[in-house]
Amino acid sequence: MESASAKTFQELGVWQKAHQFVLAVYHYSDYFPQKEVYSLTSQLRRAAVSIPASIAEAFKTTEQSDKARCLNVAQGSVEARLYYLILATDLGYGDNQQLLPQLEEVGRLLERYAVVMLDTEF
């Protein structure tokens, strides 16, 4: 697994994909109505940013319980993000279909990363 050879969290494929997803979310949400700037836009962006941020935190954490907590937060943010995308679609805030496959890929990679990291002794 790449995590064994990674020296920084930026070298992790799961972090790289999550970061690319955040950039896509920012671009997508730029087109939300101004009235959403402090609500859905903010919620969507915070949930998206939480994914790579939690992966980065888990990378440096040495305690397994802390690693598990960080990765669980990231996984929860994936699910929250899915809901926000559904809500944005239902509110008519543009087409986000290109984001769904990215989010699914991040979720799958995160699941595999969590299994490997939590099965590894440090």
Describe each model-derived feature in a short phrase.
Residues M1-F122:
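Amphipathic alpha-helical assembly/interaction segments
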